[in-house]
Amino acid sequence: MQRQTVCRACARRAPLSVERWRCECGGLLDLEAGPRFDPGRVEAETWSLWRYRHVLPVGPERWRGVTLGEGCTPLVAPEPGRPDLLAKLDFLLPTLSFKDRGAAVLVTAAAELGAVGLIADSSGNAGTAIAAYAARAGIPCTVYVPATTPPSKLGQARRHGASVIAVPGSREDAAAAARQATGAPGVLYASHVWNPLFFEGTKTLAHELAEQRGWRLPERVVLPVGNGTLVLGAHLGFAELAAAGIGGRPPVIVAVQAEACAPIAAAFRSGAERVAPTENRGTVAEGIAIAAPARGDQVLEVVRASGGALVTVTDSQTRDARRRLAARGIDVEPTAAAAWAAACALPAGDGVTITVLSGAGLKSG
């Protein structure tokens, strides 16, 4: 049975469809809960995130023509003498960022729904991931990006055959341009923010972390946050594990923003329940520089419910963390380095902390 979408604002339920990416009331959509997670149904012979196919909202076979082998990334301890501080190397996914998790599931579902075109907006990584999986599925794709996006990311999406449209202004301006272009019959808005199918892919991060550690969960996870794709997906996966009685207490979520653009962290510090837009003062961690995150309130709710925190790091801390990782053979982009900087600043002795290194250094030069 096809899973239903549920509006976060008015609770209206409706089937998944190609053209419907938000509720008629304007609200954000979630996907209703799916089957119970069962370790016994993990497909051990499938070395990708599709080993968890029994909890993914796609049919039994379509994924085989879309997958690029995404998932099952290494878990390592980069800091000498800190076996409690681990890094999940999601920058080793096919297009070099964690966004491949969401893109693989979203594009597979889009193909099953009969989409004849995809529209996405991105600061780089999500657009590249959608472009790659759209190419694999044979679906035309258009990606709207801020004009300030690094050329390396634009070139990658174009090589996958996507039409890339650079929009003057901010990340939010690019998203607005993409939304204005939606509405044609059969064209799906492949937004990693608005489309709940994307979170169904990023949730597999949690499943992998548990399986890699013998179905034990870490005490903390440290995740970069801009729009919240990674935080919300990870939370969804941990919730599925908790509902199945796996791994004990879900981990505390520490979400990391750049000091120069930190609207969710500002709301957390002030005790607010709503996230107010802020100014993007410019940061090397451009992948998390989102001044008005559409799901900011949801991220705030999830982090607080986990017992976690939202923290900020300076560009100086981010650059230093990037250099230290590179000196140990791990080259990541500034957005990932920001999370590592925050993780290294946390006190030791509170159990295992896992940081997701979300994007490769090649992405930003």
PLM region spans:
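PLP-dependent amino-acid enzyme catalytic core
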Residues: 1-365
